[in-house]
Regions:
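Conserved phosphate/ATP/ADP-binding segment of small-molecule kinases
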Residues: 95, 99-172
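Short glycine/threonine-rich catalytic loop with a Thr-x-Gly-x-Asp
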Residues: 176-183
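Residues that form or immediately flank small-molecule/cofactor binding pockets and catalytic motifs
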Residues: 23, 94, 159, 178
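Conserved N-terminal subdomain of the carbohydrate kinase-like
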Residues: 1-69, 73, 78-88
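Structural detector of well-ordered beta-strand residues that form the stable sheet scaffold
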Residues: 89-90, 155
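Hydrophobic residues at beta-strand termini and immediately following loops
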Residues: 21, 172-173
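Short, flexible active-site-adjacent loop segments at beta-strand->alpha-helix junctions, enriched
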Residues: 71, 93-95
C-alpha cells in the first residue's frame, strides 16, 4: 500500500493544517460505469479503512468540520454529534449510504438520518443518493425534505446541474463538465 505524506501534500496550501488519522488498511475500489453520463455505476471493493474514532480526533479549532468517507462505517454515526459540538458539520452522505457487501458496493437508506440530520449544517448528496434518502425523484422536493429533516443547507449534484437549497430558495447552476472521468 502506498504511503502519502499528507502534511507534505498540503504544505503549499496557505493556512491549512492537516491532522491525519491513520488506518492499517486503505479503501480500494473499482468502478464500472453503465451510462455515458456516469450517473449509474457498479463498484467492487477490495479493502476498506478502519473506522474513524472520536477519541482519535485532535482538539481542532475550525469553523467547519467536513466528514467525507467512501463507505458506511468509515465515519460512525456518533462522529456527527461529536463534530457538531466543535464546529458546523458538513457531510458527504455517500459515507452513510454506500455499504460494502460481498465485495460489491450497494446503497441502503441511512436509518438514523432523521436523528442525525439536525446536526448537519451542509449536506452534500448526488441525485441518486437524494432519492434513496427521501424516495423522491424531484431534486428540489428532495432538498426540501432533507431540510425538513434538519439539514440546514443541501447541495444535490446531477450530471446536468448543481442544486442548492437553504430553506428559503432553490438555486441551480448548470454543469458544463469538460470531463467526467474520475467522477
Amino acid at each position: 500500500t502506498a504511503q502519502v505524506d499528507l502534511a507534505a501534500a498540503f504544505s503549499p496550501a496557505p493556512n491549512v493544517t492537516v491532522y491525519p488519522l491513520h488506518s492499517r488498511t486503505s479503501f480500494v475500489t473499482k468502478n464500472v460505469y453503465h451510462t455515458p453520463d456516469r450517473e449509474r455505476r457498479t463498484s467492487t471493493v477490495d479493502s476498506v479503512i478502519e473506522p474513524y474514532r472520536t477519541e482519535e480526533v485532535p482538539d481542532i479549532d475550525a469553523a467547519i468540520w467536513h466528514l467525507a468517507g467512501l463507505a458506511a462505517g468509515d465515519i460512525p454515526n456518533e462522529m456527527i454529534p461529536f463534530a457538531a459540538r466543535h464546529a458546523m458539520v458538513a457531510i458527504d452522505v455517500q459515507t452513510m449510504l454506500r455499504w460494502v457487501e460481498n465485495g460489491g458496493m450497494v446503497y441502503h437508506d441511512w436509518a438514523e438520518k432523521k436523528e442525525l440530520l439536525p446536526y448537519v449544517r451542509f449536506l452534500k448528496t448526488d441525485a441518486a443518493e437524494a432519492e434513496i434518502l427521501t424516495g423522491l425523484t424531484d431534486r428540489a422536493e428532495a432538498a426540501r425534505q432533507l431540510y425538513q429533516w434538519g439539514a440546514k443547507e443541501i447541495l444535490i449534484t446531477h450530471n446536468t446541474e448543481v442544486l442548492v437549497y437553504d430553506g428559503r430558495e432553490i438555486y441551480t447552476c448548470p454543469i458544463r463538465a469538460r470531463n467526467l472521468s474520475g467522477r
